[in-house]
Amino acid sequence: MVKDEPLSDESADVIVLADREEDDICELEHLRKLFIGGLAPYTTEENLKLFYGQWGKVVDVVVMRDAATKRSRGFGFITYTKSLMVDRAQENRPHIIDGKTVEAKRALPRPERESRETNISVKKLFVGGLKDNHDEECLREYFLQFGNVVSVKLLTDKTTGKRRGFAFVEFDDYDAVDKAILKKQHAIKYVHVDVKKSIYNLDKKEKQQPGGLANAIKPSLNQQQQQQGGGQQPPNGNMQAPSFRPPVPPQQAMGPYQQQPPPAPMSAPPPNFNYWGPPPPAMPPYYQQPPPQQMNGWGPYPPPQQNGWNAPPPPPPGAQQWHANQWGCPPPVQQVPPVGAVPPPMGHNGPPPTAPGNWNMPPPVPGAAPPSHQQQSSQQPTPQPNFGTGYQQNYGGGPSKHNNMNANRMNPYSAGPPNSYHTPQPPAYTGYNAGPLPPNGSVPPPTGAKAVGVSNGSVATGGSANSKYRR
């Protein structure tokens, strides 16, 4: 039986020195620390220390927990006494703790943990600040100390062929890149170079993702809008989309005894249909509610072609006419109510005026009763738009000046003064409910007087008549 020989003094001294060397801490903490991610919820500090103690002496172990619930946050840190122990642990990956594969990475210094570049795991390094004497062989030889080098690529200018001063070094493992990054200064052939993680391809992919997602979202948004909007889409042309226009409340009719006919059935407008102009005679109005009747043009949507600028010539007599104060809808059919019928209540805009003519229509002659609609349609079948005193519509689309020298030249589009003694042209009296034309040579009575002395059939004027009512 062979007995164990006692160790000599020299062998005992070697073991003691080896233990002391492992206990000596002469390197930075982040070079001796490992980050362990993906821990199980029930993994404790004892399990971590027992597992990673097989590759070196562990001086510190911590599992990060929530301050309120004290539950594990799924990651922790292991600190060795030497950096070579970290290399041993990384060479023996993958690591399985409590039945779960964890992710072991070299820990970064605290100021660099918030940097996006250092937190990404890549296998390629960017090396900048190279000189003309730096070639691929010297780069490969230098970076072999961190891990197995797969490729080295020096970039050159395509036109001149000169080197651009930087290169890319690729490894077979991301741990070699992290190890090279933790070394702050790199000198190759006595020249300090800049070493960073190559994240160019990652930035390119991230820039492409928002555009691709936006292009994928656009069709779905269009489908949702079509489903929510419902109905028919507006055709191409000059028509404005009716969905962007608020609904117009129905107004009261012009007269107390007028009734509104029922609206025509809905139908989509034809393509290339000008929504702002009057529709063809056979086209019903393009809205669901009854068409409102404008009073003196005061409505929520005044017509843009009210004064007839750039308007087509009037249709021949006998055709269906369109009034300027009605916005793209045909004139309503007037019906006389039976005797004894109660008139409908007035609208919210107050009582309608007696003559809803155009804006620039001269006032009617006092004392003359306005004719009915049937008499007006028989006497004046073609109403012309009023352009003010002294103007009439031209077939070219704009107003034309006649030979009346007494017209108001400073304000041609406004109505004439009530006491003007010139005879206006017939187109100026073609309003909707305008009275008959006064006889030629007649003199309008003065306004504001209650009684005027009449002598031999003529109206008495002069200073005596005016001083009678002066106060």
UniProtKB/Swiss-Prot annotation:
Q: Which UniProt keywords apply?
A: Developmental protein, Differentiation, Repeat, RNA-binding, Spermatogenesis
Q: Where is the composition biased (Pro residues)?
A: 259-293, 300-318, 329-369, 436-447
Q: Which residues form the RRM domain?
A: 32-109, 123-198
The record's SMART domains line, in alphabetical order, gives: RRM (SM00360)
User: Which PROSITE patterns does the record cross-reference, listed alphabetically?
Assistant: RRM
User: Which InterPro entries does the UniProt entry name for this protein?
Assistant: Nucleotide-bd_a/b_plait_sf, RBD_domain_sf, RRM_dom
- Provide one Gene Ontology biological process annotation: spermatogenesis
Q: Which CDD domains match?
A: RRM2_hnRNPA_like
From the record, what ranges are coiled-coil?
Answer: none
Q: Name one Pfam family in it.
A: RRM_1
Q: List the biased-composition ranges (Polar residues).
A: 401-411, 455-471
Task: Name it.
Answer: Ribonucleoprotein RB97D
Its source organism is Drosophila melanogaster
